Amino acid sequence: SGKAGRKQINFTSNTGFTTPVRLPDMVNSVEFANYFNAATFNALGTRQYSEEKIALLQQYINDPTSVSIFPEVSNNTYGSWENSANGVANTNWFDLHYKPYAMRQNYNVNLSGGNEGTQFFVSGGLYDEGGSLRYADINYNRYNFNVSVNSQLTDFIKVKSNVKYTQNENKTPLAGYEDMFFHNLARMRPNVSPYDFYGNWNEQSMIPYLQSGSEGKTNNGTLVLLGGLEISPLKNWKVFADLNFRRSNYDGSTLKLPGTIYGID
């Protein structure tokens, strides 16, 4: 709570950045093809990537403009795009989807003051953190509010009260499919391009779903009320009575919309 005397106002703000840690260190498409060939040859006696395909992958790494990234594709049909040995690219799927950093901001303001009989303290805060995914509008916000008042009503009666409220809001376009998104992200082959025949994001990139307008929202609120009474009927004899009340509420909503995948029927 505040102290007797003149009012004081304090304001603080902090801005920082978050960055992903311990992301997988992905191999390039040539290394992947050689590893995959070794695995399939040991298991089945066959190789999925021919020497010609591996040479094309190396050529793409050396000069991406010197080779077609769709040598097996002749049209933009839906079935042309799959997570297979088809395609010539060098896609790091984690680099594609993760930004190098995301911004976070924290603001707090408080007011305190009072007199010999009553002291008060009021504070409020806002915390905002953006998500690390490049093509997904993910945000986390937290709001908090606090009021505390202590009052000496008489020489032997003192009351105190405190109200705290916190609201947490989380928004994501993954709309309940977070596990599937990250599961698929780690399984995509680097020789597969995120683009279709005409330069649009293909389904394997998962970006059409992130930009479809789908949205999952959750809100968590907590209200805490604290009250206390202190009575001193006799010298060196104090009686305390405290009341605590806590209430939490949660609500969530999910909107799932189809992604726009370009192609021909």
Language-model regions, residue ranges each:
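Periplasmic N-terminal accessory/gating domains of Gram-negative outer-membrane beta-barrel systems
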Residues: 1, 16-17, 95-97, 102
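A beta-strand signature from Gram-negative outer-membrane beta-barrel systems
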Residues: 1-10, 104-106, 119
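A generic beta-sheet turn/junction motif
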Residues: 4, 113-117, 126
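Surface-exposed loop/interface segments of Gram-negative outer-membrane beta-barrel transport/assembly proteins
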Residues: 4-89, 127, 131-224, 240-242, ...
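Outer-membrane beta-barrel initiation region
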Residues: 100-101, 111-114
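Outer-membrane beta-barrel channels and translocator barrels
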Residues: 104, 115-116, 152-156, 232-234
